[in-house]
Amino acid sequence: MQLGLSVSDSDASPFTPLAVLELAHDTKAEAIAWLLNRIRDKQRNGGAELLVDQLLFPAQDGQKPNPNVFVVGSTLQRLLSGAEDVGLFKEFQDGTMRGFTYANRESFKDFEGDGEGFLGDAECQYIVKHELDTLRAKNEEYIPGYPKYKLYPGKSIVRRLQSKGVLVQYFPLHNKEDLKRLSFSWYKKIKLSFQPLDDIRSYFGEGLGLYFGFLEYFTFALIPMALIGIPYYLFDWEDYDKYVLFAVFNLVWSTVFLEVWKRCSATLAYSWGTLGRKKAFEEPRAGFHGPLGLNPVTGREEPIYPSSKRHLRIYLVSVPFVLLCLYLSFYVMMVYFDMEFWAISIYHENPNFATSVLLFVPSIIYAVVIEIMNLLYRYAAEFLTDWENHRLESSFQNHLVPKVLVFNFVNCFASLFYIAFVMQDMVLLRQSLATLLITSQILNQVMEAFLPYWLQRRRNKRVYKRMRRLMGDKELPLLEQIQLETEMNTYLGTFDDYLEQFLLFGYVSLFSCVHPLAAVLVVLNNITEVYSDAFKMCHVFKRPFSEPAANIGVWQLAFETMSIIAVVTNCALIALSPQVKAYFPESDAQLILTVVAIEHVLLAFKFILAFVIPDVPKHIQVKLSKLDFESLEALKKRKILEVAET
């Protein structure tokens, strides 16, 4: 994909664009010149040493286009040296994964000639992003042309430009040929086989590769439960006593499922070079603010915000707000039960087809309300977490995730707990679970895939018509592509995707013993989810930058917490079984003590199983230990040589 357009630097040779930078329409000329100079400048002078050219779009319907759109690329040698700077791991000749060094490039597998094709597309774009993000202010006091926009020595220029609205967006470009091949092998043909995870990782990066790996693993892991659930559904529909065995299987399955996933995740992460990779030093978030102070770790000046003030905001504002939202969720739940009782009373007064259909209406309305409340709360939680002013993105996520998980858990499952343990109505529990699950699946598919696709398709048609009308029959595939991708929606990460799978895991593990078909419904949902998520990543959203990941992060803990709650829930459901109650006809206290004892035994078994099954396969542990040993030996030899020289 060679650049053959009007450019701002006539001396620049054509190069392959890897990313797009869009500055604000009214950005000062001196700020643009300063930024481009820093991007092009040599590394020894504090620059990124990248290639950058300006795109000149034609006027659109009498409106002047944004002239401040630039494409960024790099020479091959700069990418290879950048791979060493970011600590990229590649496969060595002996089959182990090692940190890439330019000096030893010939010792790495698949490195041939000058190294063309050695780095994947996503890796090249990640290197470019890293070099842009680590462009640091030197002795400038402010952004040229903006005296009020202060610069701090040693701090990221790009993050400062983003926080002040000068840099509108920057994103990696799609590679049409690679995308076409990936689309064909991924979702354009119906097949009963595994996803091309290595190709997904090579194109989108490790973070998305692990998400789709988890989605695939979760779907296949549900198949045994689905196969067992079908005969239970067909032959023992009203016999809840038979579901005791299904509940026990559920408990064992949820533990084994998560422990085996850790091993699968470690295998994928090692083969992709992220398992033993050290995390880069985390820069402050773009929105972080506070009075200027000295960072005790780096010794640089940067905004400082007292943790005491942040804690006051959390405990005096955020926590009460979350509790208020939980109260509103309970209130809406009680309104739903009033509607449910009203529908049941009408059915009992006049049982016919119309009133039998009416029985499902309250649950459907409640499911829609749940999705709306989850969406509104998500925006509020993000606003509050941003207002708490966390310095690092990891801290921001660690405070956002619990807020969202707690509310979504209560909002989605509180009614089911109430029906199961207060009303003790298993028929209504089965009906409500099925209705909530099916309705939420349909709404998620519409909101996540079909609606964005329809909006993007309309937007694409407008762009195609406008570009063809302006440029006639001229060949402009790259210009047209960049125009399209600039107007695409930004992919906000895997948060919502993991959240959806977390809730589905809850439906399966918490109450599936009273509705064994839940696993079947989730399997069908996830099969369509694979195709819809693949399509939206390829054609609906901007291509995201690669995000190195060694596991699914905080979501592993979230799923494990859900599995522990599932043990308690299923033990309680077993205790409500008439068959179990028959063993304790005279003493409810004895029944409760027995169930609690069994629950503790199952939890102990769960933790023992988690301890017995290693998180990392033995052969990978050996390779990692071997690498650590060789690194220590190399360090010893270097110290001996230094001593000998002195």
From Swiss-Prot:
One of its GO terms (cellular component) is plasma membrane. The chain crosses the membrane at residues 210-230, 241-261, 314-334, 357-377, 404-424, 502-522, 557-577, 592-612. It is found in: Membrane. It is a multi-pass membrane protein. GO terms for biological process: chloride transmembrane transport. It comes from the Eukaryota. The keyword Transmembrane helix applies. GO terms for molecular function: chloride channel activity. Keywords: Membrane, Transmembrane, Transmembrane helix. The keyword Protease does not apply. Its main location: membrane. Pfam families: Anoctamin. Does not exhibit calcium-activated chloride channel (CaCC) activity. Can inhibit the activity of ANO1. Belongs to the anoctamin family. The term 'anoctamin' was coined because these channels are anion selective and have eight (OCT) transmembrane segments. There is some dissatisfaction in the field with the Ano nomenclature because it is not certain that all the members of this family are anion channels or have the 8-transmembrane topology. This is Anoctamin-10. The lineage of its organism: Eukaryota, Metazoa, Chordata, Craniata, Vertebrata.
